[in-house]
A protein has these predicted regions:
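CE4/NodB-like, metal-dependent polysaccharide N-deacetylase domain
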Residues: 2-24, 117-133
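Active-site and substrate-binding clefts of carbohydrate-active enzymes
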Residues: 63-386, 408-425, 437-444, 449-513
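Asparagine/serine/threonine-enriched low-complexity, disordered tracts
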Residues: 649-651, 660-668, 674-676
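Extended alpha-helical scaffold segments
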Residues: 525-654, 677-701
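Extended, Lys/Arg-enriched charged tracts that mediate electrostatic binding to polyanionic substrates
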Residues: 50-52, 56-71, 384-412
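Active-site-proximal loop/turn and secondary-structure-junction residues that shape catalytic pockets
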Residues: 26-29, 48-51, 94-96, 136-138
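Short, solvent-exposed turn/loop segments enriched in Gly/Ser/Thr/Pro and often Arg
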Residues: 21-30, 50, 169-172
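Acidic, His- and aromatic-enriched active-site or binding-groove loops in soluble protein domains
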Residues: 2-17, 38-81, 156-160, 192-193
Length: 701
């Protein structure tokens, strides 16, 4: 019930109206689920054809068996529920959906359109619906350029006179069901055994590792069920101390999830709280509700779908469980981690390195739990590399600086301060003191903890400053160890994205120095390399390595220049070929592609800018001369509308381009003569034709 309510409210918040239909994950269905949909005003959902059991026409008493994918997918059906409510059901076209997902139907937009139209039949009477259900990833991720095939197919159908595009709501409005249907309960579209894929080793898997088993699914399910059933009564009992109806509050908690502002939280608590809550009660109540949120998230279907317990999808559901356990520890005072891990121990990984669910949980989930200490440690370290203001946001935490000072001596820096950390999710606040010592490069050490007595914090600050100003680095480290003991951190304590950014900053100087040295080595040895090549003498591997690093680096820099020198690029390519250097095609292609996309975007914004058009033409020439393929898809998409409409608006655009081209070096416009204007228009047209040709728009007029 809660998840259906959340889905309805989320849709309404984003689109300004209530939804008419709702997709069931994996089309997994039973009657209570359909009752929950109908109760919230959902008119329809979509199922797989094999989930239909039997149908009968309105007014008829004769049921027709349609099991085994034999239902007619071209109409809507009505299902009568035990509550006397009804819900409409659509059953997608199985063969066409299968063709999209697994048979390469998206390789050809025309064939895709024809197949969709082939879903209609002259043997049927009345209006027909041709429709499919597939993963969204099919269009571009699983099938490269699948979104283009979809676009072509929809445009082709829309421009023809055989059918018109519609949606389920409109079709229901125009052609209400005239057949009843009954379904097979506890079935889905992706498990031949009903819904066993989400609780047992039923045999359904990706097929990528036939030697593996999925015996881990059952104990994983049991562990999560135990956690859910342990948290639910505790939530009801403890939540009842501050909430009139904890379960009704959970239903409405979606309003807070969608808007974490203090105003929304206050309005939510005003509606549901038994009394005006103090700060501690408010924080505990929000933690309980967030605990329930994660107790639902941990049932995300992909956690069981794939083959291995240590897969990222399954680890993610364990992360959700870990968050629920962490919140339970804070809000209920109960530590459920060990009994949960005992149950996970029965879930065996197919990979010896991971053993079982307990080891996976302790290796990846437990260390990732975010606390105010970790946020403060992240703030302290990252503050050495970027200037934070008095207030900053780190993910879902607001950090307010209370005190902060930095001492510098050469490459060594010492930062000491305190900050108030507030969770935007639970509104929990902590004020923590920190100190961090950066010895240069990646050598960072520090500590963070709560100081009940501010005088103790100030004493620490003065001790550290004294030791630092006396160049007593060992003394600084000793003081940090004494005051922070186990609450220490390093660059490893940073959240992953920021960790990589800072490591890249640290590496820049080292890389720059190394690259300069290697380039100098190559330039010194280049004549010898040419001589060896002229004699067909094998070049020593060490020389080839130096040449590879130097030439790939120079090419990278050449392609990154604001105005790429085509001759310089060609010269470097010839030199690489002469020295038998393997180009770093992946990195160079990415750089060239991004340059093209940037220039294509500039042309898309200003199609009358002759200079932008010329730069795009030049970049396309350079890309064509590279000894590897450069992807043009995004550049094509950016330019398509402009190129397709260029002929229709050609004169106006050409005149504007000619006028733009007449600007002198001071940015002033000289009045163009008719002759100059004609020449400018002709130049723009030539450039446009060249760009169109190089982007492979041969038929665009």
């Amino acid at each position: 019930e809660t998840q259906v309510i959340w889905g309805v409210r989320d849709f309404a918040a984003r689109f300004g109206r209530k939804p008419e239909g709702m997709w069931l994950p994996e089309t997994a269905v039973n009657i209570p689920t359909l009752e929950a949909l109908a109760e919230q005003g959902i008119r329809f959902t979509i199922l797989a054809p094999r989930q239909a059991r039997r149908v009968r026409r309105y007014g008829s008493r004769n049921w027709k068996d349609v099991s085994g994918d034999r239902i007619d997918p071209s109409r809507a059906y009505q299902l009568r529920l035990p509550s006397k409510k009804t819900i409409s059901l659509f059953f997608y076209d199985g063969p066409i959906s299968q063709g999209v997902a697994f048979e390469g139907l998206l390789n050809d937009g025309k064939r895709f359109a024809d197949r969709l139209l082939g879903g209609f039949s002259d043997d049927r009477v009345g209006p027909q619906l041709s429709h499919i259900a597939t993963d969204g990833e099919s269009y571009g991720h699983h099938h490269h350029h699948g979104e283009m095939a979809l676009t072509y197919a929809l445009r082709s159908i829309e421009s023809g006179d055989v059918a018109k595009l519609t949606n389920y709501g409109q079709f229901l409005e125009m052609h209400p069901p005239d057949h009843w249907v009954e379904i097979f309960e506890n079935t889905s579209w992706s498990c031949a055994h009903g819904i066993e894929r989400w609780k047992s080793n039923c045999g359904c898997n990706s097929g990528g590792h036939p030697e593996w088993n999925q015996e881990w699914r059952e104990p994983l399910r049991h562990a999560l069920d135990w956690l859910r059933d342990t948290l639910a009564p505790a939530f009801e009992r403890r939540g009842g101390e501050s909430l009139k109806d904890p379960w009704a509050a959970r239903n409405d908690y979606i309003d807070v999830i969608l808007d974490r502002s203090s105003e929304m939280v206050a309005a939510f608590l005003a509606k549901h709280a038994t009394h005006e809550l103090n700060r501690e009660e408010r924080v505990r109540t929000l933690k309980l509700l967030e605990m329930q949120r994660h107790a639902m998230l941990m049932y995300t279907s992909c956690g069981w779908f794939f083959d291995e317990l240590s897969g990222l999808e399954t680890v993610q559901v364990l992360h959700y469980a870990g968050r629920a356990i962490h919140l339970a520890r804070k809000a209920l005072g109960e530590d459920l981690a060990e009994p949960f891990c005992e149950r996970l121990r029965n879930a065996k990984s197919n990979l010896p390195d991971h053993a079982n669910g307990e080891e996976i949980y302790k290796k990846w989930v437990a260390p990732s739990v975010i606390t105010a200490d970790k946020v403060t440690g992240h703030y302290a370290v990252s503050g050495l590399f970027e200037a934070y203001g008095d207030q900053t946001r780190i993910y879902c935490y607001d950090v307010t600086r209370e005190e902060y000072s930095v001492e510098t001596e050469g490459r060594v820096r010492l930062a000491v301060g305190s900050a108030r950390v507030r969770s935007l999710i639970t509104t929990d606040e902590n004020t923590l003191g920190f100190a961090v010592l950066h010895l240069g490069d990646h050598n960072i050490t520090g500590g963070v903890r709560e100081f009940q007595d501010q005088n103790r914090f100030h004493e620490l600050r003065e001790q550290l400053k004294t030791a630092f100003t006396q160049a007593d680095t060992a003394g600084v480290i000793r003081i940090l160890d004494e005051h922070f003991r186990k609450s220490t951190f390093s660059i490893r304590s940073l959240f992953r994205d920021e960790q990589r950014r800072i490591i890249n900053l640290i590496l820049q100087d080292a890389l720059s120095s190394a690259t300069s040295s290697i380039r100098a080595m190559y330039e010194n040895q280049a004549p010898l390399l040419r001589f060896l090549n002229s004699l067909s003498v094998p070049v020593p591997g060490a020389f080839l390595s130096v040449a590879s690093i130097a030439l790939n680096g120079q090419l990278q820099q050449a392609l990154e220049r604001p105005d790429i020198d085509a001759a310089a690029v060609q010269g470097l390519l010839r030199e690489a070929e002469l020295n038998h250097v393997n180009l770093d095609a992946t990195t160079l292609e990415f750089t060239m592609r991004k340059r093209l996309e940037e220039q294509a975007a500039a042309f898309e914004q200003k199609p009358d800018d002759l200079c932008a058009l010329k730069r795009l033409h030049g970049l396309l020439d350079i890309a064509a001369g590279l000894p590897f393929h450069v992807g043009l898809a995004t550049a094509q998409e950016l330019c398509f509308a402009r190129l397709a409409g260029a002929t229709a608006n050609g004169n106006a655009l050409a005149q504007a381009a000619a006028a733009n081209g007449s600007r002198n070096g001071n940015g002033n416009t000289a009045a163009p003569t008719t002759q100059n204007s004609d020449a400018g228009q002709q130049e723009w047209s030539r450039e446009l034709s060249a760009v169109r040709e190089k982007l492979c728009f041969h038929g665009t007029t």
